[in-house]
Amino acid sequence: MKKIKVLFVIIFILLFASWSKPREVNITDMEIREGITYVKGETKAFTGIIKSYYENGNLESEGNFKDGKLNGLSKVYYENGNLKSEGNYKDDKLNGLSKVYYENGNLKREDNYKDDKREGLFKGYYENGDLKSEDNYKDG
């Protein structure tokens, strides 16, 4: 009886671990049909993480998808591995804080978005990190 309980717990843990890890797919295995992203040859809209890579093998981009649309954090990288940009998406639209970086890693700009339109504070920076400009946006 004790062995059955232990076996049940192990099976439960393995199932839970497989559910909690998002599916990761290379962008070369993807296709877009009618604005929805799918793994080639599959009929269900993709949920998970799509990644693309530079020819040198370094990560170029990674984006979270839910039901075939960008949802959550998306990042793009320079070929040297430094972060180029990051932003949050909801149903394929930028929402929340978006950041763009210079290749040296310093912040280039910060924008806030609502439904893919600038909304709120914008800050632009020189490559040395000094503030260049600041503005407020309403409805894009």
What is each stretch, according to the model?
Residues 10-12:
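Acidic, gly/ser/pro-rich intrinsically disordered tails
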Residues 14-140:
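Glycine/tyrosine- and acidic-biased, solvent-exposed loop/turn segments at the edges of beta-strands
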